[in-house]
C-alpha cells in the first residue's frame, strides 16, 4: 500500500500543472493574435494605399508633350515663319501591349485611314509576314534547329534571323495593298517608347478620317485624335536658307546633332532646329514642354493622368531684316543677273550677293544671295543668301580703304603723300604692275577716286620697308603680311564677323610671302573675303572706326495667343567688337576719298545723281573660276565688287555688292555691281519713306493683335 502513495502524489501534481500550461498557451495565443491584429491595422490603415498600389502594381511615369514653336517676324512685324496646325492621329502604347494587340488595332485603323507606305522597309515586311503567318513561318525552321534552341546552342534571336533570311521574294509578294496599309500603321505604333504618343498620321489627315476615328476611339485603345504643326513660310523661299529648318515628327533629333541635343535633356523624338536661325535660337523657339504624369495599372494600362506642369509656347523672334527690302533686293539681283547673262563673256557668271547693315548698331537689314542656272531653256534662281557668309572671293579695289589706313597708321605714308602712278617693273617682269591707266601724281583721295593700283603698290612697298628700282628685285620685310592682316582684321577682313548664325566661314589666306604677293594683297587680289566681311569693313569706315557685330535678331518676345504680340523679353544691344587702332583724321581722309568715288570717280556714272549722298569704293579683281562647273576650274576671270554707305555725312546704311566671275574678257567689262548698288540704296530710302509715312510697323502690330482677338473669340 505504501508503494502506491507516490503515484497518487505525482498524479495530483500533473493535474495542478495542466491549467498553468493552458493559461500560458492561451496567453501566448492572445499575444500573437493581438500582434497580428495590430499589424493588420497598421498595414490597412497606415500603409494601406502603399500596399494597395503594390498589389495592383501601379506605376507613375512622367511624359512630356510638345508646345507651339515660337514665330519669327521681320523688323516691321511681318510674320515670316509661323506654325500651321495639322490634324493628327496618334497612338500611345502601354508597357504590356503585345504585338498581336497592336496588330489588331492597326487592322481596325486601316479601315478608317489611308497612310503613306513609302517608308516601309523590306525588314518591316518580313517581320509582318512572320507575325501574320505563324504556321508558314514555323515551317522555315527545322526540328533540328528548334532542338538546338532547347539545348541552348543557339538563341531564339538566332532562330528568328534564320526565319527572316529564308523568306523569299515570292512570299513577300503575297502582301496585298491592305497588308501594306496595316503594316505602315503598325510600324508607326511600334516606334518610340511606351506611354509616349507616336504620330500614326499627321499629314493630309482629312476631316472625314478625324471624324471616323473619333467615333471609334473606344474600340482603339491607345489611339487619339489630336493636332500637330509644321513650319509655314508666308514669303515662300525668301531668305529660307538663312531661316534654317526644323526636324519632322518622324525624324526627331537629327543624327548629326543627336549627342548635342541629348546632352541638353531633349528626347529622341523631339522636333528641333536643324540649321541656321532655327538652330541658333533653338533654346528660345522650343518653349517649355507640358509634363503629364501617367498612372498605369498592373497590366501597364493608363488608368489616370495628372498634369505636373503646364507647357509654355516658344519665344518669338523679331529679326533686324526688313522682309520687304529683302524681297526687293532679291528681285533686283535676279533682274541684273538675267540681263548680264545676255551679254558676251559671261558664261561663268552664276551668282551675286548683297549685304546691307546699319553701321550704327550692326543690324543686318538684308542679306541676299542668288544663283542663276539655265534649265529647259529658261533661267531659274535659287536662294544663296548663306553664301554671303560661307563663300569667299578676291574683292579687288574695294579693300583699298584698308590699305590706305594701314599705310597711314604704320607711318609708311601720311596725309600729304603723293605717288606717281606709273607702271612698276619688278625683276624680269616686262608686263609691269600698273593701274587701269597711267594716272600721274596722285594723293590719297585721288588714288581712291580713280582706283590707283600703283598708289597701293607703293604704299605696300613702304610698309614692307622696301625700295623700288625698275627691273630689279624687290626685297621686302615679309612681316608686312602680318602687319596688313592685323589692320585689315580690325575692319573685319579675314576674320569672322561674329554674326549670330552657326557655320560662318572666313576666306583664304595666301601662304606664299613673295614680294609680288604683298602688292597683290594691297589691291585685294591675294586673300579672299566673304560678302559679309566686306559689309562689316565698309560699315566700320562709315561709322568712324567701330567694328560692329552683325545681328540678325533684334528682339525676343513672349508668345501671346490672346494679344498676338507678346512683351519684350530681351532686346539685343549693339555690340562693338573693337575700335580700330587708327586716328580719326585718317579715317576721315578715306571717307572723303570714298565720297569722291561716288561723285566723280569710278562709281559716279551710277551714284553721282543720288539725292541721299552716298560714298563708295568699286572693285575689280583678276581671279580664277572655282565654281560648280569643274571642267572650267582655274579659268581666268574677273570678280566685280562695290562697297558703299549713305548718307555720307551721317550713314544709316552700309552695303557690299559682290558678283564673282562677272566676265572673262576685260574688254567686255561693265558696271553690274554699281547698278545693283544704286537700285538697292534707292529702294531702301524709298521704302523707309513709305514705311515712316504709313506707320508700317504699328499697322502690322495692330493687324496681328486683331487677328489674335478674332481667333480667340472663335475658339470660345
UniProtKB/Swiss-Prot annotation:
GO terms for biological process: cell wall organization; peptidoglycan biosynthetic process; proteolysis; regulation of cell shape; response to antibiotic. The keyword Hydrolase applies. GO terms for cellular component: plasma membrane. Residues 689-706 have a biased composition (Basic and acidic residues). The chain crosses the membrane at residues 22-42. Keywords: Antibiotic resistance, Carboxypeptidase, Cell membrane, Cell shape, Cell wall biogenesis/degradation, Hydrolase, Membrane, Peptidoglycan synthesis, Protease, Transmembrane, Transmembrane helix. Induction: Transcribed during vegetative phase, drops off during sporulation, rises again 30-40 minutes after germination. A small amount is present in dormant spores. Disruption phenotype: No visible phenotype during vegetative growth rate in rich media, no difference in sporulation or initial spore germination. Spores have a significant delay in outgrowth, between 60-90 minutes cells swell rather than elongate, upon eventual elongation they have a larger diameter and are often bent. Single deletions have reduced peptidoglycan (PG) synthesis and turnover rates. Double ponA-pbpA deletions spores have greatly decreased viability, PG synthesis and elongate poorly; increased levels of Mg(2+) increase spore viability. Residues 689-716 are annotated as: Disordered. It is an enzyme of class 3 (hydrolase). It catalyses: Preferential cleavage: (Ac)2-L-Lys-D-Ala-|-D-Ala. Also transpeptidation of peptidyl-alanyl moieties that are N-acyl substituents of D-alanine. Its EC number is 3.4.16.4. The keyword Cell wall biogenesis/degradation applies. InterPro entries: Bact_Transpept/Beta-Lactamase (IPR050515), Beta-lactam/transpept-like (IPR012338), PBP_dimer (IPR005311), PBP_dimer_sf (IPR036138), PCN-bd_Tpept (IPR001460). It is a single-pass membrane protein. SUPFAM superfamilies: beta-lactamase/transpeptidase-like, Penicillin binding protein dimerisation domain. The active site is at 397 (acyl-ester intermediate). GO terms for molecular function: penicillin binding; peptidoglycan L,D-transpeptidase activity; serine-type D-Ala-D-Ala carboxypeptidase activity. Pathway: Cell wall biogenesis; peptidoglycan biosynthesis. Its main location: membrane. Belongs to the transpeptidase family. Involved in the synthesis of peptidoglycan associated with cell wall elongation, especially following spore germination. Has a partially redundant function with PBP 1 (ponA) or PBP 4 (pbpD) during spore outgrowth. Plays a redundant role with PbpH in determining the rod shape of the cell during vegetative growth and spore outgrowth. This is Penicillin-binding protein 2A.
Amino acid at each position: 500500500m505504501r508503494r502506491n502513495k507516490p503515484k497518487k502524489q505525482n498524479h495530483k501534481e500533473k493535474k495542478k500543472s495542466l491549467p498553468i500550461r493552458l493559461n500560458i498557451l492561451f496567453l501566448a495565443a492572445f499575444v500573437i493574435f493581438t500582434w497580428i491584429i495590430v499589424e493588420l491595422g497598421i498595414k490597412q490603415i497606415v500603409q494601406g494605399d502603399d500596399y494597395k498600389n503594390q498589389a495592383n502594381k501601379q506605376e507613375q511615369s512622367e511624359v512630356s508633350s510638345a508646345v507651339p514653336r515660337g514665330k519669327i517676324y521681320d523688323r516691321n512685324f511681318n510674320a515670316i515663319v509661323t506654325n500651321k496646325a495639322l490634324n493628327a492621329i496618334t497612338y500611345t502604347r502601354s508597357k504590356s501591349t503585345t504585338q498581336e494587340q497592336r496588330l489588331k488595332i492597326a487592322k481596325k485603323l486601316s479601315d478608317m485611314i489611308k497612310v503613306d507606305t513609302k517608308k516601309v522597309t523590306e525588314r518591316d515586311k518580313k517581320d509582318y509576314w512572320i507575325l501574320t503567318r505563324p504556321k508558314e513561318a514555323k515551317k522555315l525552321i527545322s526540328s533540328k534547329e528548334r532542338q538546338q534552341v532547347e539545348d541552348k546552342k543557339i538563341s531564339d534571336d538566332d532562330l528568328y534571323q534564320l526565319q527572316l533570311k529564308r523568306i523569299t521574294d515570292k512570299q513577300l509578294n503575297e502582301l496585298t495593298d491592305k497588308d501594306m496599309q496595316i503594316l505602315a500603321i503598325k510600324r508607326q505604333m511600334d516606334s518610340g517608347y511606351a506611354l509616349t504618343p507616336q504620330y500614326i498620321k499627321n499629314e493630309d489627315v482629312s476631316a472625314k478620317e478625324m471624324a471616323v476615328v473619333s467615333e471609334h476611339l473606344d474600340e482603339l485603345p491607345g489611339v487619339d485624335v489630336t493636332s500637330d504643326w509644321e513650319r509655314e513660310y508666308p514669303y515662300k523661299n525668301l531668305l529660307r536658307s538663312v531661316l534654317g529648318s526644323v526636324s519632322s515628327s518622324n525624324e526627331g533629333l537629327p543624327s548629326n546633332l543627336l549627342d548635342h541635343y541629348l546632352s541638353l535633356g531633349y528626347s529622341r523624338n523631339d522636333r528641333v532646329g536643324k540649321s541656321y536661325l532655327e538652330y541658333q535660337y533653338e533654346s528660345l523657339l522650343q518653349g517649355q514642354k507640358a509634363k503629364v504624369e501617367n498612372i498605369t495599372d498592373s497590366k501597364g494600362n493608363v488608368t489616370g493622368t495628372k498634369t505636373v506642369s503646364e507647357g509654355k509656347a516658344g519665344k518669338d523672334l523679331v529679326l533686324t531684316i526688313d522682309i520687304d527690302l529683302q524681297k526687293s533686293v532679291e528681285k533686283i539681283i535676279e533682274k541684273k543677273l538675267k540681263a548680264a547673262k545676255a551679254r558676251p563673256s559671261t558664261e561663268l557668271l552664276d551668282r551675286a550677293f548683297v549685304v546691307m547693315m546699319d553701321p550704327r548698331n550692326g543690324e543686318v537689314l538684308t542679306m541676299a544671295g542668288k544663283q542663276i542656272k539655265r534649265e529647259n531653256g529658261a533661267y531659274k534662281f535659287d536662294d544663296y543668301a548663306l553664301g554671303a557668309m560661307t563663300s569667299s572671293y578676291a574683292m579687288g579695289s574695294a579693300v583699298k580703304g584698308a590699305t590706305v589706313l594701314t599705310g597711314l597708321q604704320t607711318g609708311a605714308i601720311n596725309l600729304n603723300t603723293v605717288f606717281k602712278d606709273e607702271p612698276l617693273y619688278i625683276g624680269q617682269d616686262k608686263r609691269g604692275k600698273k593701274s587701269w591707266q597711267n594716272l600721274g601724281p596722285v594723293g590719297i583721295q585721288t588714288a581712291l577716286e580713280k582706283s590707283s593700283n600703283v598708289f597701293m603698290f607703293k604704299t605696300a612697298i613702304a610698309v614692307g620697308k622696301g625700295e623700288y628700282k625698275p627691273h630689279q628685285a624687290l626685297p621686302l620685310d615679309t612681316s608686312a603680311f602680318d602687319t596688313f592682316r592685323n589692320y585689315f582684321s580690325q575692319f573685319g577682313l579675314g576674320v569672322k564677323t561674329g554674326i549670330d548664325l552657326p557655320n560662318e566661314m572666313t576666306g583664304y589666306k595666301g601662304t606664299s610671302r613673295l614680294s609680288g604677293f604683298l602688292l597683290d594683297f594691297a589691291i585685294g587680289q591675294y586673300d579672299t573675303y566673304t560678302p559679309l566681311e566686306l559689309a562689316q569693313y565698309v560699315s566700320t569706315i562709315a561709322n568712324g572706326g567701330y567694328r560692329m557685330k552683325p545681328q540678325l535678331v533684334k528682339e525676343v518676345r513672349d508668345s501671346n495667343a490672346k494679344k498676338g504680340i507678346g512683351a519684350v523679353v530681351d532686346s539685343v544691344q549693339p555690340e562693338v567688337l573693337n575700335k580700330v587702332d587708327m586716328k580719326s583724321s585718317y579715317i576721315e581722309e578715306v571717307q572723303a576719298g570714298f565720297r569722291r568715288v561716288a561723285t566723280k570717280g569710278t562709281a559716279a556714272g551710277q551714284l553721282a545723281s543720288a539725292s541721299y549722298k552716298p560714298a563708295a569704293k568699286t572693285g575689280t579683281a583678276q581671279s580664277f573660276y572655282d565654281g560648280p562647273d569643274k571642267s572650267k576650274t582655274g579659268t581666268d576671270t574677273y570678280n566685280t565688287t562695290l562697297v558703299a554707305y549713305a548718307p555720307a555725312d551721317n550713314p544709316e546704311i552700309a552695303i557690299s555688292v559682290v558678283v564673282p566671275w562677272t566676265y572673262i574678257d576685260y574688254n567686255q567689262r561693265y558696271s553690274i555691281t554699281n547698278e545693283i548698288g544704286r537700285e538697292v540704296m534707292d529702294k531702301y530710302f524709298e521704302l523707309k519713306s513709305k514705311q515712316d509715312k504709313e506707320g508700317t510697323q504699328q499697322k502690322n502690330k495692330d493687324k496681328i493683335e486683331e487677328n489674335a482677338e478674332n481667333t480667340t473669340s472663335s475658339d470660345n
